[in-house]
Amino acid sequence: MTTLGTPLSPSATRVLLLGSGELGKEVAIELQRFGVEVIAADRYANAPAMQVAHRSHVLDMLDPAALRVLIASERPHVIVPEIEAIHTETLVALEREQGQKVIPAARAARLTMDREGIRRLAAETLGLPTSPYRFVDTAADYREAIAAVGLPCVVKPVMSSSGKGQSTLRSEADIDAAWEYAQTGGRAGAGRCIVEGFIDFDYEITLLTVRHAGGTSYCDPIGHWQQDGDYRESWQPQPMSAAALRRSQEIAKAITDDLGGWGLFGVELFVKGDEVWFSEVSPRPHDTGLVTLVSQELSEFALHARAILGLPVGAEDGGVIGQSGPSASCALLAHGNGVPVFDNVADALRDPDTALRLFGKPRVDGHRRVGVTLARADSIDAAREKARVAAAALGIQLTA
């Protein structure tokens, strides 16, 4: 797709975002830089990407009939799934029946919508190294799986994100509460879970991998720290051995080649010395990749947009995307109930080479990531500290 039209005209190039969170918002902005007409959809009104789209729709994207009605009415040239909670079988059917273009491909969206499809592909079809695992449907199966993989272990709903429904079990005392949380915290309600054994790793990375018209290219590895299964900080580049980096790229290429299509993939990996294990992959920008807003010449969102549109990404097949030096991000979390209001913004931006993104999420109920601070420095440690200081300076209030 190297010919682009004018938005809101008969020549418009229309892209439908299924999911309108903060990652979708940045993708929408990058698409609009190329004059793309952006339509944003999500299950709630005024989602972040809706605030920068040409128009928006609120619907249950797990409802196949509602999804078909939306796609028929908007007639998008390209559909870009931005979350897992989509009836992906509808996308598969539309791709097959009508040639509907889905990014990166409808099969990739279906396989990665839950942990089972992608884990079985990686471990059982491609033979990639992973943690030991079992899939379970009942409390009895769950207890058998724990006995098989051993403690400590992790339990996650097969369909969830941002740590929802996820628990780490360190003793038998954790077993019942973890099962209950897994049955209530997933995106699709009670149901199937994965029980994963622990890997003794040194660190974990996200290797952003972009499949584009010119081949496959890689970003420098992103290190990250998670709490309760959710991203808190990320930094780039993560130091690692040449052998581990080479193996990481080999694993990323194997999984993304099988999924196919064009777009950016977030490949999550565990690393110990020169050894690498596959963890997960998302066929879209990754929350840990928010650091690329300041760390790269082209952010993960710009890369995704360019790949979607068939445009050059600034790196050759097998090459590495340009990087600007040690950089870090720190997530901003709000706790409570209400509409976020931010103060001390000037203080948060006082240090040079510090940036801030406020996502525009319309409401917080419980806890929610509402923004991110970003920083560059002479070292990873210094960049992380600058991002933390900026985050601590910002005040977050919730109003009725």
Curated annotation (Swiss-Prot):
Role summary: Involved in the de novo purine biosynthesis. Catalyzes the transfer of formate to 5-phospho-ribosyl-glycinamide (GAR), producing 5-phospho-ribosyl-N-formylglycinamide (FGAR). Formate is provided by PurU via hydrolysis of 10-formyl-tetrahydrofolate.
GO-annotated molecular function: ATP binding; magnesium ion binding; phosphoribosylglycinamide formyltransferase 2 activity; phosphoribosylglycinamide formyltransferase activity
Cystine pairs: none
Signal peptide segment: none
Positions of Mg(2+) binding: E268, E280
Reactions it catalyzes: N(1)-(5-phospho-beta-D-ribosyl)glycinamide + formate + ATP = N(2)-formyl-N(1)-(5-phospho-beta-D-ribosyl)glycinamide + ADP + phosphate + H(+)
Quaternary structure, from the entry: Homodimer.
Domain (ATP-grasp) ranges: 120-309
Protein's name according to its UniProt entry: Formate-dependent phosphoribosylglycinamide formyltransferase
GO CC annotations, alphabetized: cytosol
Pfam families registered for this protein in UniProt: ATP-grasp, PurT_C, RS_preATP-grasp-like
PANTHER family per UniProt: FORMATE-DEPENDENT PHOSPHORIBOSYLGLYCINAMIDE FORMYLTRANSFERASE (PTHR43055:SF1)
Keyword vocabulary terms for this entry: ATP-binding, Ligase, Magnesium, Metal-binding, Nucleotide-binding, Purine biosynthesis
Pathway where this protein functions: Purine metabolism; IMP biosynthesis via de novo pathway; N(2)-formyl-N(1)-(5-phospho-D-ribosyl)glycinamide from N(1)-(5-phospho-D-ribosyl)glycinamide (formate route): step 1/1
EC category: ligase
Binding site for N(1)-(5-phospho-beta-D-ribosyl)glycinamide: E22, L23, E82, D287, K361, R368, R369
Family: Belongs to the PurK/PurT family.
Originating species: Xanthomonas oryzae pv. oryzae (strain PXO99A)
EC nos: 6.3.1.21
